[in-house]
Each structure stands twice: as structure tokens, then as C-alpha cells.
Amino acid sequence: MLAVNGGRFRFDADLLADLAPPVWPEALLVRAQGQVADVIGSYLHLPGPHRPQGARGCVLGLHRSGEAIGISAGTDRAAADVIAWICAVSKVPQPHEPGHVLLLDWMPDPLPMSASMPAEELLRLRRMLRSSFFTGDHPE
């Protein structure tokens, strides 16, 4: 999940929906319905490759307030690509600025994001998390 940490910055669901098709030609914005619509304004489906056992792509839950985006992805690579893209096109504030954006559930602690954070850096941090340094499996 990407979440705004105070300040005035908000994610723009319409902007993301407008900018997604050049990257994901089959992108589809679906308005949320029912009780979930109290929190989620819409879902942006970003399909993955259409092949047997292909990654399922990503689904973004765009919070009505613009303060958060839930991310469900088929692979870490797909998630990292989408997270980096969202931060770049949304021009998120720098980590030291009011309204900066945090990536939750990627590392043990919230990760401050910037508009220039590449997907490769997100994947490197994810690999570090899974290394023996973080799991406590240290050779004696």
C-alpha cells in the first residue's frame, strides 16, 4: 500500500487511469460498488501477460480520499514496476516534504518514497528483506 503521510498531497485516480493505457494497453478503471465504495473509489486493473501461467498483473484499490492506494500484484516485479510508475507520474513529494508517501508492507518499516525511486531499488530492498541478515539465519 502507498499511503500519504499528512500534508496536502493526494493521489489522482483519474490521472492514473488516463496515463495507464500507454503502459498497460488493456488497463481498465472500474468504479467500486457496495459498502467498499465508502472507502475505495475505484479499482484500476493493469493486466499482466496473457499466456499460460503468466503473471496476473496488478489491481490498484484507489482510495476515495486520494490518501492511499492498495496494490495487489502477481509478482514482486509487477508490484515494483507499478509502484515506481505511480510515484513517478503522481510526482509524489520528497521524503522530507509534508505529504510525503510511504510504502507499507514491503519492508518491516514504512519506506519513504520519491518520484525517482526506480523499480530495481524496490526489488533490491525486497531481496535484502528475504536475505539471512533479516531472517536471523546467521552462520555461527
What are these regions (language model features)?
Residues 18-52:
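Surface-exposed, low-hydrophobicity interaction/linker segments
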